[in-house]
Amino acid sequence: MLNKLKIGTLLLLTLTACSPNSVHSVTSNPQPASAPVQQSATQATFQQTLANLEQQYQARIGVYVWDTETGHSLSYRADERFAYASTFKALLAGAVLQSLPEKDLNRTISYSQKDLVSYSPETQKYVGKGMTIAQLCEAAVRFSDNSATNLLLKELGGVEQYQRILRQLGDNVTHTNRLEPDLNQAKPNDIRDTSTPKQMAMNLNAYLLGNTLTESQKTILWNWLDNNATGNPLIRAATPTSWKVYDKSGAGKYGVRNDIAVVRIPNRKPIVMAIMSTQFTEEAKFNNKLVEDAAKQVFHTLQLN
């Protein structure tokens, strides 16, 4: 299994530096610049630790981190594809805020029992009554409600239109193809509903820290992510209580377990990060501790814990 991954040649660690405001995407969102890999004992230790985690959990792990305080980025399989699962719901909420007038957030969307799919803890409460677009966004982000997600995609014009919005954001990597819950099938070598850790982190950065949304829109998205009810055992579990983690988790078949986040630390600029993982059998159960351990190693490498 893992021997097929050719760990020694595939696991890449890059640590780059730039001015956070010196490089811009098509939407003028600051991003880290590319730089040659710098060999160091720290990088070698990080690489070996992540390789050990992959062996320990029998999984493939991808990590991308941008420290906006220093401009440094840290990556490990950051350009490999993973099923994004429910992490995209944070970006979907950003796309809704970007695409619709703010007054539309209070517009009620009606739906019936036939519109419900598996795992819809909030939308099932309001069948026949409907929910506002803001309520649907909060249900999708905070509770990972699948029916809310599908209703929002429909409101935007479907998965094709959502992908066009990502392309306008500067994302030429992510493939959006299916609705919930089918997008969580996560079959190996299937590029449908996949992205890379780097792209997921940069999209989250664009919506929360970039210029894509207005300040009032960003405040709304921050609040939805701050109240996320599904992320406690993931990146948040690797942080002290004084830090704030604004995240969206995801899970799927083949043991997929992901978390994307902006981490706010007192007296410094935030960290943008994505941790994605997958296993090798369809029935594999995801492991929260894998994500927590990967996050701990990130913070240790950045000398933050």
From Swiss-Prot:
Gene3D superfamilies in the cross-refs: DD-peptidase/beta-lactamase superfamily
Residue numbers annotated as active site? S86 (acyl-ester intermediate)
Keywords, sorted A to Z: Antibiotic resistance, Hydrolase, Plasmid, Signal
Instruction: Please state the span of the N-terminal signal peptide per the UniProt entry.
Output: 1-33
Please give the catalytic activity noted in the UniProt record. a beta-lactam + H2O = a substituted beta-amino acid
Protein transport: is it a keyword of this entry? no
What Enzyme Commission number(s) does the record list for this chain?
A: 3.5.2.6
Enumerate the InterPro entries for this protein: Beta-lactam/transpept-like (IPR012338), Beta-lactam_cat (IPR045155), Beta-lactam_class-A (IPR000871), Beta-lactam_class-A_AS (IPR023650)
One Pfam family hit: Beta-lactamase2
The entry marks the following residues as binding substrate, namely K248, S249, G250
What Gene Ontology molecular-function terms does this entry list?
A: beta-lactamase activity
What processes does the entry annotate via GO biological process terms? beta-lactam antibiotic catabolic process; response to antibiotic
Query: Note on file?
Result: The class A beta-lactamase family has a specific amino-acid numbering system, sometimes called Ambler or ABL numbering and often misspelt as Amber. A multiple sequence alignment was used to derive a consensus sequence and then the consensus was numbered taking into account insertions and deletions. This allows use of identical numbers, e.g. for active site residues, despite differences in protein length. UniProt always uses natural numbering of residues, hence there appear to be differences in numbering between this entry and some papers.
Indicate the family of this protein. Answer: Belongs to the class-A beta-lactamase family.
PANTHER family membership:
BETA-LACTAMASE, BETA-LACTAMASE-TYPE TRANSPEPTIDASE FOLD CONTAINING PROTEIN
- What is the name of the protein in this document? Beta-lactamase ROB-1
What is the scientific name of the source organism? Haemophilus influenzae
